[in-house]
Amino acid sequence: MIFSRRTGLKGTLTIPGDKSISHRSIMLGSLADGITEVHGFLNGADCISSMNCFREMGVTIDHNGDTVIIHGKGLHGLQAPKETLDVGNSGTTTRLMSGILAAQNFKSRVIGDASICRRPMKRIMTPLSLMGADIVSENGNDCAPLLITGKPLHGIHYDSPVASAQVKSCILLAGLYADGETSVTEPYVSRNHTELMFDAFGIDIKTSGTTAIVKPADKLYGQKIMIPGDISSAAYFIAAGLITPDSCITIKNVGINNTRDGILEVVKMMGGTITYDRLDQPGEPSADITVQTSDLKGCVIQGSLIPKLIDEIPIIAIMACFAKGQTVIKDAQELKVKESNRIDVMAVSYTHLTLPTNSLV
């Protein structure tokens, strides 16, 4: 991609692999029998944390560039870690892995950096405890470090108070080991990478509206996984192409899962010029996305759209500053409990840039 003050942004680019799918490929590949081959793996610190945690539990994982080969241990083949499982800054690793650890035949301690040790874990501790898990907060504050003693689990139906793919996935992963059916209902549909990957690995998973239902698994089968580019990373280039004068850029092989494509919907709501050519390839749906400089207009973003773009709200707020009229973002409270309070950070940062914003709620 080329940038010039005279010609704007021009050209094509490829972005790194999807973070959510990368995490899940490590976890399910580790629990499968046989080899799982992953292409397009995201080499970010969070995904490496997932990889290292499962290595600590005896899984052999070969890593070369964006290719990962996982030598699965089977559903019941994980070994007790010799050290504390350090998730770094990864909330996804913490919450999803806890669902797996709750059913193992060993004890484990899960810790992360200072940010992780402030993030709320009661949202997974409650449903796991209802399933029979022994999971406690070491400091008694419902945050990491977490102490988990594996126990036999039983299936439950859980009405989640939040639309969170991490909470849902934690429960579904525990459900693989539970006695009986496990189901989760959310207020809105959250991203469904776990459900799609469950299906690919041969797990009995069904969805109906905002409910996901899993039956206990006997065996998972190693797979070949092709990971598309992360739409959350693409969002920054999409925004740049829309607001930079005289621009036209194409972003290759971007994941357009319909539980993650909220940014594309917002661009259309704001009047942006965007097209995408769907790709015919294995794995989750993907496309080459092209955007051009556009005159944007304000819009209202709320409700069921929020879980589809929760990680893209900071860049959407930037787009809104270049749009004609007011943009309102509602129902975004989840941003307050990320690695930082993203709402406050956005409000303060944009004030320093003299951009007109009020705090989002």
Stretches found by the model and what they are:
Residues M1-N43, H71-I116, L147-Y188, I213-I256, ...:
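Structural motif
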Residues M197, I203, Y236, A240, ...:
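A structural feature that tracks compact, well-ordered secondary-structure segments
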Residues G132-S137:
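A glycine-rich helix N-cap at a beta->alpha junction
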Residues F54, T259-I274:
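Conserved loop->alpha-helix
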Residues T351-T357:
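Conserved small/polar residues in nucleotide/adenosyl-binding loops
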Residues D46, S50:
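N-terminal cofactor/phosphate-binding cores enriched in small/glycine residues
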Residues D62, I171, T275-D277, I318, ...:
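Interaction-mediating elements
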